[in-house]
């Protein structure tokens, strides 16, 4: 294998060619940073969190492929992944994951002690999630916790504390992750049933679409409550209304459970995250005394 081929395999291992995972992890982190800083996050902290998100998501992908190295060859969507296809070794995947995790840890060392302490459970959750599909009926809930840890870390880095509001945002994001990752799981449900993998799409059975919609509703309702506590204005609530419209569009995509359409719905969640961030950003830029 040439150097270019190996570099391409490494890039595909950590999914740099598929940035959707980075974006879905980044949006709630940015929500947390902007709300913690009331619209004026420290530039150094912002850069650290953006780079850290990229590094940890990439490390998580490498760990995921290591954990699923004997499963991926039997799933049509994943059989061509570098590790499953034999282009790289399990040892290489572990070394890459460890290297990226170390870089992410070194990156946060300039931040306060609380942020560094929170990075420990964040790393554990990211590293252990891929193995939960063997014994958890709802591994998407575990992923939701892992994908939400950027929020308390953002508050800790920006303010030195983790207030109840941060955990309310974690709760909201948890249900969002369950919703979009269940859409993702619908793509592979037929293969997962054959090989015995557990996912929320399998656990929910015929209530899968209803469960996704319920999780989206809880997600948006919790954000609405957070907005009330923070006395947010029209831009924030307008963004939530747009996000609700996007959820309705997603329902049209997933209601027939066609794998290709379910995957499109999963990708569509990037726009929900972006719209909510835009609402938070505009709300802090054009703050008025009026709020709902």
From Swiss-Prot:
The protein's required cofactors: Mg(2+)
GO MF term set: 4-hydroxybenzoate polyprenyltransferase activity
Catalytic activity: all-trans-octaprenyl diphosphate + 4-hydroxybenzoate = 4-hydroxy-3-(all-trans-octaprenyl)benzoate + diphosphate
Cysteines paired by S-S bonds: none
Pathway: Cofactor biosynthesis; ubiquinone biosynthesis
Biological process terms in GO annotation: ubiquinone biosynthetic process
Annotated EC: 2.5.1.39
Gene Ontology cellular component annotations, sorted alphabetically: plasma membrane
Keyword annotations of the record: Cell inner membrane, Cell membrane, Magnesium, Membrane, Transferase, Transmembrane, Transmembrane helix, Ubiquinone biosynthesis
Keyword Cell inner membrane (UniProt): yes
Enzyme class: transferase
Membrane-crossing segments per the record: 20-40, 43-63, 94-114, 135-155, 160-180, 209-229, 234-254, 266-286
Keyword presence, Transferase: yes
Family designation: Belongs to the UbiA prenyltransferase family.
Described purpose of this protein according to its UniProt entry: Catalyzes the prenylation of para-hydroxybenzoate (PHB) with an all-trans polyprenyl group. Mediates the second step in the final reaction sequence of ubiquinone-8 (UQ-8) biosynthesis, which is the condensation of the polyisoprenoid side chain with PHB, generating the first membrane-bound Q intermediate 3-octaprenyl-4-hydroxybenzoate.
Name of the featured protein: 4-hydroxybenzoate octaprenyltransferase
Source species: Nitrosomonas europaea (strain ATCC 19718 / CIP 103999 / KCTC 2705 / NBRC 14298)
Gene that specifies this protein: ubiA
């Amino acid at each position: 294998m040439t150097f270019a081929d190996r570099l391409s395999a490494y890039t595909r291992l950590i999914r740099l060619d598929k940035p959707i995972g980075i974006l879905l992890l980044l949006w709630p982190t940015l929500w947390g940073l902007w709300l913690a800083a009331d619209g004026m996050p420290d530039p150094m902290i912002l850069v650290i969190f953006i780079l850290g998100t990229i590094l940890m998501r990439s490390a998580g992908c490498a760990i995921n492929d290591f954990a699923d190295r004997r499963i991926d060859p039997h799933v049509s969507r994943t059989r061509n992944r570098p590790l499953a296809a034999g282009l790289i070794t399990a040892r290489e995947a572990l070394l890459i994951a460890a290297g990226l995790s170390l870089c992410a840890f070194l990156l946060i060392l300039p931040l306060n002690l609380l942020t560094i302490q929170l990075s420990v459970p964040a790393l554990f959750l990211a590293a252990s999630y891929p193995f939960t599909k063997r014994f958890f009926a709802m591994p998407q809930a575990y992923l939701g916790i892992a994908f939400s840890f950027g929020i308390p870390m953002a508050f800790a880095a920006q303010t030195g504390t983790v207030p109840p509001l941060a955990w309310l945002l974690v709760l909201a994001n948890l249900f969002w992750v369950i919703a979009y990752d269940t859409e993702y799981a619908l793509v592979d449900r037929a293969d997962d049933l054959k090989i015995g993998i557990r996912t929320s799409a399998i656990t929910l059975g015929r209530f899968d679409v209803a469960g996704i919609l319920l999780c989206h509703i809880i997600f948006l309702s919790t954000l609405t409550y957070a907005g009330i506590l923070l006395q947010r204005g029209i831009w924030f609530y307008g963004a939530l209304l747009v996000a609700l419209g996007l959820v309705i569009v997603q329902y049209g995509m997933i209601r027939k459970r066609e794998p290709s359409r379910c995957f499109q719905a999963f990708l569509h969640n990037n726009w929900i995250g972006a719209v909510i961030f835009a609402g938070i950003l505009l709300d802090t830029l054009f703050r008025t005394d009026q709020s709902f």
